[in-house]
């Protein structure tokens, strides 16, 4: 088993444990949606998840996808990214990171820069806020759009 596949399986197991600890029943569809999100590096929309899973789950609906994404979001294992167009994208991530977003095609790429975590501490110190989180987006043109 490859290291990436082991990581996906480990994250899936941890997420299923979190869901169960919150009283959520694990269905085959719910598990498939979660596994797709964990393995995806594209920050998919609900429609993209539906397109990917509907061949294996012919009875799945877009509403089922949205309902499960809401459950995952409420528990904190998925983040909704309401960037750009009217379709939110969804991100499975268990660590802090930022997003670089293509202004032309909407592609979102993860960007890790741990030094920015200090921003929260400084903001809290300077403002006396109890800082809970922060979000940063960087915009530009991805390589594919530059080459067009």
Swiss-Prot record:
Residues where Zn(2+) binds: 102, 105, 142, 145
Keyword Transcription regulation assigned: yes
GO BP, sorted A to Z: negative regulation of DNA-templated transcription; regulation of secondary metabolite biosynthetic process
Cross-referenced Pfam families: FUR
Top-rank taxon: Bacteria
GO cellular component terms attached to this protein's record: cytoplasm
Principal location listed in the UniProt entry: cytoplasm
GO molecular function, one term: zinc ion binding
Region (DNA-binding): 1-84
Alphabetized InterPro entries for the sequence: FUR, Fur_C, WH-like_DNA-bd_sf, WH_DNA-bd_sf
Cellular localization per UniProt: Cytoplasm
Swiss-Prot/TrEMBL keywords: Cytoplasm, DNA-binding, Manganese, Metal-binding, Repressor, Transcription, Transcription regulation, Zinc
Stated family: Belongs to the Fur family.
Record function comment: Manganese-dependent repressor that controls a regulon of oxidative stress resistance and iron-storage proteins. May act as a hydrogen peroxide and organic hydroperoxide sensor.
Annotated protein name in UniProt: Peroxide-responsive repressor PerR
